[in-house]
């Protein structure tokens, strides 16, 4: 199984993102934001930030390629059961920030996914949840 860092829009179908449908490819690839994929299996979008965002607007403001405090997982999806968890397990060892936190929608599915995969809820916000993963 090969993990890739996306460098071209042809490598990922962002229209398949069930959570962040309106987020353009350019946004996902600028200011410290990246996309990782296990081709045809799973995708995760990350952002490096100096502060913990609780909204997508804050994520946009706080994203910075020089940030070393947080890696934010703001969307993850898979095409087959189990690959969402697998891509997180592949990506975490590659990251070099102090903390690994999600910006998750307020859904039961997000709670189940992240808690089953070892994350701890650290913040219940007006528009989102933040779960923290540990290496």
Predicted regions and their residues:
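Short amphipathic alpha-helix that is part of the acyltransferase structural core
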Residues: 1-27
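A short helix-loop-beta-strand connector motif used in the catalytic cores of GNAT acetyltransferases and
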Residues: 24-42, 48-52
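Short, high-confidence coil segments that cap the C-terminus of an alpha-helix
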Residues: 33, 68, 96-97
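Conserved acyl-donor/pantetheine-binding loop and adjacent beta-alpha core of acyl/acetyltransferases
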Residues: 41-71
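Conserved acetyl-CoA-binding loop-helix of GNAT-fold acetyltransferases
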Residues: 78-94, 116
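Conserved GNAT acetyl-CoA-binding A-motif
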Residues: 95-106
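Conserved active-site alpha-helix within GNAT-family acetyltransferase domains
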Residues: 105-128
